[in-house]
Structures are given as C-alpha cells and as structure tokens.
Amino acid sequence: MAFKRRVKNSDLREIVYSALSQVHGTGLFAKRAIKKGEYIGTYHGPDAKRDGTYVLWVFDKGDEGNAVGRSGRNLLRYLNHAKPGNAEFDGFDLYALKRIPIDQEITFNYEGS
C-alpha cells in the first residue's frame, strides 16, 4: 500500500461512524466517501495478552508464531468481517481496498489476505 498522510485519531470521527449493522451488532460506516488506497485510521488500544472481543492480532509474515495483539479502544473496533472486505490492515493501519461510498459499512476479512 502507498503511504498516505496519517489521520489523527481525533479526526477519525470525521471519516467514520458506528451504527447498527446488518452484518453483526454494531458496525463501522463511512461518514464520507473514502478513496481506494486511502488511509482510514490506526487500530489504537493497549497490548493484548490473550484473545477477546475487539482484539486485533497482527502476524509477522516471516514468523506467524510471533503475533502482536491490540485491544481496540477507538471506532475501528466496530469493524465487521466480510469476505472479501472493502478494507484491509497493514500492521495496525487500515486502508480502503476500493472506493467506499458514504454510509457503506467498512469491513475486512478476519482471516487475512
């Protein structure tokens, strides 16, 4: 992915919002149109020691036994699963895989790419 200017966590609410999802529970939605390849935000929160709700695990491509977990504390914790999703993580940074229209749910493939 091409690196884009980082969106401050405080600005995340200018890009996305949470609402009732048709996929599952609460979902994350585009507050404005998001361009393909655009940086959406970073999954913030404390390090996780074990799996649980809102924990995102990032695996080292060279060593899948070496994973870092983060317990989500910002709006990105409401991302739901879809296969294929319309966004993907590069580390803890979320990028749009394609153009995401306003009010469309933002999803990613929990199984990775």
Feature-to-residue mapping (PLM):
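Conserved catalytic SET/PR domain of SAM-dependent protein methyltransferases, capturing the structural core
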Residues: 1-113
